[in-house]
């Protein structure tokens, strides 16, 4: 996540060189004993291995979810619509954030033109914004579905909201193209690094990214799930009152109908609320260490220099892109089941077609051989038959 380590020289993580290119002069004394052109290869190998595993799980999981939604009969529901776009956002994170970081860790330096450097760091943050805001949109939808169910029954312009989320993600990521560039870090050695003109630049930008991607979304998510929890508590309380009145009511049928309707509202939506809550919890767990370390490194006059701390925080942030699809599978098991059934059905159909093709080919060969033998037999019979003339 070179493009995410805005204040740090992430390409030098393995050898604990954590000073931003714009801050090297004021911190030169603390780095004088380090060689910025070398790294700890053992730590780099571990990081490459973990990133490769995260990339595989993220690609496999999100592709399975998208295929499962495609073949599922409920794919036009609002929840599946948001799940689809959150999976697409996670794929963007995997392809344009985790994969470039993996290649970067393998090569150690950025071996590409300046334009590619700016584009890669830009797309790295696009995926992070899109994934966060798509999760926020999904949670707001669940909040409306629980707190205002009559309003949520009307089909809203979901495509407009999703399109706005993507456009906003692309726009908010544009500063990356200005901040990052191909910079000389040694004698003839170039790397893709951040460069701030003003000394307060890293603090301002890191704080802005943390607010836009983490703090403000988490605050909104907390309000959403606070309202959802309160509404569910009210729902359970009403259900309990109705069930107690059922024993005393003279109009048992009307009360039973009321109890059933309350239970229906709860059962229809509680599962999706649980799923989105677990996704939000995974997001907070994965990204909290990363943003904490980012803010610590720019606001503390004596930031930590331990490479392992920053590497773990970075890898945890990347891990979020492969968590979501497996959470989907856990709460909507029929997605995986439908995908597996479709795969088995297609495989059986393919094998059956192949078998029919081979049987037809064998039948044609058999008929051809029979025809040749009969022709040969008839010709021999005509030769051996005596002439009547």
Swiss-Prot record:
Cytoplasmic face of the membrane: 72-87, 141-159, 229-275, 330-389
Protein name: Mesotocin receptor
Residues bearing carbohydrate: 15, 20, 27, 31
Keywords (A to Z) from UniProt: Cell membrane, Disulfide bond, G-protein coupled receptor, Glycoprotein, Membrane, Receptor, Transducer, Transmembrane, Transmembrane helix
Record field: transmembrane: 51-71, 88-108, 120-140, 160-180, 208-228, 276-296, 309-329
Pfam families: 7tm_1
Renumbered residue ranges of the record's region Disordered: 360-389
Keyword hit for Transmembrane helix: yes
Lineage: Eukaryota, Metazoa, Chordata, Craniata, Vertebrata
Organism of provenance: Rhinella marina
């Amino acid at each position: 996540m070179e493009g995410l380590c805005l204040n740090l020289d992430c390409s030098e993580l393995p050898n604990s060189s954590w000073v931003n290119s714009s801050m090297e002069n004021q911190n030169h004394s603390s780095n004088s004993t380090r060689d910025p052109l070398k790294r700890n290869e053992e730590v780099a190998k571990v990081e490459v291995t973990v990133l490769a595993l995260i990339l595989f799980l993220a690609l496999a999981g999100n592709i399975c979810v998208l295929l499962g939604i495609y073949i599922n009969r409920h794919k036009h529901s609002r929840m599946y619509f948001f799940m689809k776009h959150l999976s697409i956002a996670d794929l963007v994170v995997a392809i344009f954030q985790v994969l470039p970081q993996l290649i970067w860790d393998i090569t150690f330096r950025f071996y590409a033109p300046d334009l590619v450097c700016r584009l890669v760091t830009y797309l790295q943050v696009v995926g992070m914004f899109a994934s966060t805001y798509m999760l926020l949109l999904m949670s707001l939808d669940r909040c409306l579905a629980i707190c205002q169910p009559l309003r949520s029954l009307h089909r809203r312009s979901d495509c407009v909201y999703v399109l706005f989320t993507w456009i906003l993600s692309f726009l908010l990521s544009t500063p990356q193209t200005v901040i990052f560039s191909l910079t000389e870090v040694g004698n003839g050695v170039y790397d893709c690094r951040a460069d701030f003109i003003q000394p307060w630049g890293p603090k301002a930008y890191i704080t802005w990214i943390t607010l836009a991607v983490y703090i403000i979304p988490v605050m909104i998510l907390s309000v959403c799930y606070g309202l959802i929890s309160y509404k569910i508590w009210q729902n359970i309380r009403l259900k309990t009152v109705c069930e107690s009145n059922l024993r005393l009511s003279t109009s048992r049928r009307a009360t039973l109908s009321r109890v059933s309707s309350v239970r229906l509202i709860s059962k229809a939506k509680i599962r999706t609320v649980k799923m989105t809550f677990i996704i939000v919890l995974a997001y907070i767990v994965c990204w909290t260490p990363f943003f904490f370390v980012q803010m610590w490194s720019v606001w503390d006059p004596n930031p930590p220099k331990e490479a392992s701390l920053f590497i773990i925080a970075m890898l945890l942030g990347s891990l979020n892109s492969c968590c979501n699809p497996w959470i989907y599978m856990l709460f909507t098991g029929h997605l995986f089941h439908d995908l597996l059934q479709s795969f088995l059905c297609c495989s059986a159909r393919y094998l059956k077609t192949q078998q029919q093709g081979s049987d037809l080919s064998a039948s044609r060969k058999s008929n051809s051989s029979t025809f040749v033998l009969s022709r040969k037999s008839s010709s021999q019979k005509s030769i051996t038959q005596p002439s009547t003339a």
